[in-house]
Amino acid sequence: MAETETKHHPEHHDDDVHDANYQAPPEKTIEEIMAADQEDESLRRYKEALLGAAQTEKIIVEPNDPRKVIVKKLALVVEGRDDMELDLTGDLSQLKKQLFVIKEGVQYKVRIDFIVQREIVHGLKYVQKTSRLGVNVDKMKHMVGSYPPKKEIQFYLTPAEEAPSGTFSRGTYSVSSVFTDDDKHIHLEWDWTFEIKKDWA
């Protein structure tokens, strides 16, 4: 099963994930956020719109899971094709056995589906490092943003990336993904693989 609590690793992935010069603001509960700056009407309306139902009720989607962020799925999105999906709720060690095939040169996006429960989460980030034959060939880091608790699954879709192309680019690539936040909580990290081919088959 996926791990059931958020890990807090101040040093893990710091060089790749966190800006050493950035000081994250202190964590605040929903109650603290709503109580602050009440005299500012426009700010109050903004916070109400942002938090939605979370301002009046404690939103807990999965009571037996203590995490604030539960990452559900990764999908590779290519226009005109069915999404290629990885289930991130089971045995993460098995993900490398699921080989995605990507046609060289196509435009694709990565979508992360996740649940936020209990409290608002600040400064979510998605970092992906790609290597081939043990050599790092690409790294992308995306600021996902802050999200309130919701009963529905929320998602982040990266900007389009272009798959490598050409004879020497074909082959199998290893990917290490991390979903973290400003407070250096590692919500989930997982490894997966894809293969660049001349065509989809």
Language-model region placement:
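N-terminal onset of structured domains
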Residues: 1-154, 159-172, 176-201
